[in-house]
């Protein structure tokens, strides 16, 4: 049984080896090789092609940088805080910026060195 398998394998191998002499190796891509051999560019055409490639590359790079800058432009925003302290501070900030509610009816408070509740200092020379 094993001899039959080995002999059949050897026979097939011998046939393949004999047939390989009749086949000649052909290029994998014969069309592409012949096209590249036939194409020749003049100096003017080569410069125009190079300029177009450089222009496209610069445009693509500029677009990528623009998209990156749009994604990274973070506007400064304060965190939202709804606690009573934050709301009070925001209201006080708004009132101080807008001029307050009773700006025209402003009465100055009695503050200073002689205001009620402050100790008087005795000045000794």
Curated annotation (Swiss-Prot):
The record's annotation in SMART domains points to: CALCITONIN
InterPro entries associated with the record: Calcitonin-like, Calcitonin/adrenomedullin, Calcitonin_CS, Calcitonin_gene-rel_peptide, Calcitonin_peptide-like
Task: Provide a Gene Ontology MF annotation, just one.
Answer: hormone activity
**Keyword Zinc on this protein?**
no
Q: Give the record's GO biological process terms.
A: adenylate cyclase-activating G protein-coupled receptor signaling pathway; regulation of cytosolic calcium ion concentration
Name the GO cellular-component terms: extracellular space
**Propiece residue ranges:** 26-77, 122-125
Q: Which Pfam families did the record assign? A: Calc_CGRP_IAPP
Signal peptide (from-to) = 1-25
- Compartments, as annotated in UniProt: Secreted
The source's superkingdom equals Eukaryota
* Family in the record: Belongs to the calcitonin family.
Name listed for the protein in its UniProt record: Calcitonin gene-related peptide 1
> Which organism is this protein's natural source?
Gallus gallus
């Amino acid at each position: 049984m094993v001899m039959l398998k080995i002999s059949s394998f050897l026979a097939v191998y011998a046939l393949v080896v004999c047939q390989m002499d009749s086949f000649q190796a052909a290029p994998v891509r014969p069309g592409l090789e012949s096209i590249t051999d036939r194409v020749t560019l003049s100096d003017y055409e080569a410069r125009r092609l190079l300029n177009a490639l450089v222009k496209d590359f610069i445009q693509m790079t500029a677009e990528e940088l623009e998209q990156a800058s749009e994604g990274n432009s973070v506007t400064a925003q304060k965190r939202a805080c709804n606690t009573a302290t934050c709301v009070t501070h925001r209201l006080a900030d708004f009132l101080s910026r807008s001029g307050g509610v009773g700006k025209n009816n402003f009465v100055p408070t009695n503050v200073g060195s002689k205001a009620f509740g402050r100790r008087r200092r005795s000045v000794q020379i």
